[in-house]
Amino acid sequence: MVFSVSIFASLAPYLVSALLLFFLIEQLSYLVKKRNLPGPLFVPPIIGNAISLVRDPTSFWFKQSDTAGTSPGLAANYLIGKFIIYIRDTELSHQIFSNVRLEAFHPLGHPFGKQLFGDHSLIYLFGEDHKTVRRHLAPNFTPKALSTYSDLQQIVMLRHLRQWEESFSGGTKPVSMRDLVRELNLETSQTVFVGPYLDKEARNTFCTDYNLFNLGSMALPINLPGFAFNKARRAVMNLEKTLSVCAGKSKKRMATGEEPTCLIDFWMHAFVTEIESGNPPPLHSEDEAIGGLLFDFLFAAQDASTSSLLWAVTFLESHPKVLSKVREEVAKIWSPQSGHLITADQLAEMKYTRAVAREVVRYRPPATMVPHIATNDFPLTESYTIPKGTIVFPSVFDASFQGFTEPNRFDPDRFSETRQEDQVFKRNYLAFGWGAHQCVGQRYALNHLVLFIAMFSSLFDFKRLQSDGCDDIIYCPTISPKDGCTVFLSKRIVTYPNL
């Protein structure tokens, strides 16, 4: 024992020297990559500023944006061994989105996405492989498919709205909407994506696993047993396995000639039709691969929709004239007492309500950044080249407040047929991405938001519980109001729709 201590004591100076040398090299590497970009001159060894990010992501990212505002739209930092660049300028962000290819930039979906999602995710496909998969996804979002989903969305929404009315209506007790909306969206996603293929027990397990994934996506990326990140990775594996079983069941059902009733059915129906025509099975048509792609849909839809629905309630309450116009438009087209769901044609008529939905997404884009990794050195400007291995964060949020008329004002009329700012400032409307990896389900997502706005505003009166900073942004992992959108609810109608 004494011998071991003496050996350690003799080696200690060398170990300390080696550690200090490593820290010095790390700092010098950071400064060389940073060059003249604004950003911290010193970063904590190894972990960088990851603790600041995890402790208060809102403050961290706003600080990056402010720092980038002092330069041509760029700011540097360091996170767990990775040099990062925050991109505030819209045109510089377009250079990233327009150069998603093997030799330039790879999307990540999450700063440590490959560890979390695995390599098979749609996010990480490129070239012909990516084009082929997206082409086979097209049947999932035809007008017929979207109309089928619309009915399912409304049925789930009405069931949850009825529960809210029974539990919280009366206007005497405030309720935080975050968990209510999250549960609504999770059931909607399950029902629309895999419908009849999940029993009650599977749905409960599904919810538990998704919550573990959600928590882990916000944690430090420590992939060891007992840590939240590791639990999230295991939850993803469980979710993908569950979804792959659903894919197999759907394939068998579609092979019998039955009509599609959910997203996986439309997808598998197209696969079965192609194979019956004598073509080989499409790429990534194995049950396991489809399970992974279905999880991509779930990840893209779930938290983004939760964010948008919460902000919609927030802004409708704070803009009574907008709320009044929504109610007036919806009442002319659909009545809760009609005994019918909103049809596809009626949904298309709700032009102002759709403009409100688009403005909600512009004003508070759910995913504020879209991280990519540079696979090679990339000359971004005349004076700065992004080093290979850098994680870049093009800011969708900052782009939303550039170009548009009075961008800091919540103004749905900017999307009217008269002003058409969605076309005039199209390059600044990046909430659904840009280029080859643009969101394939954006029409579904907007329909979901429009349906919720129409139904919620028709069925409920609502008043926010005002508190200091209630509208401040927090990340969980998409952005939402700090107070969880806490409101007083009271019903507007005498009888609840019986649909």
Swiss-Prot record:
Binding residues for heme: C439
GO BP annotation list: sterol biosynthetic process
GO molecular function, one term: monooxygenase activity
Main location: membrane
GO cellular component annotations of the record: membrane
Domain of life (superkingdom): Eukaryota
UniProt-listed Gene3D superfamilies: Cytochrome P450
Keywords from the UniProt entry: Heme, Iron, Lipid biosynthesis, Lipid metabolism, Membrane, Metal-binding, Monooxygenase, NADP, Oxidoreductase, Steroid biosynthesis, Steroid metabolism, Sterol biosynthesis, Sterol metabolism, Transmembrane, Transmembrane helix
Pathway it works in: Steroid biosynthesis; sterol biosynthesis
Family: Belongs to the cytochrome P450 family.
Protein name: Cytochrome P450 710A2
Biological source species: Arabidopsis thaliana
Gene name, Swiss-Prot/TrEMBL: CYP710A2
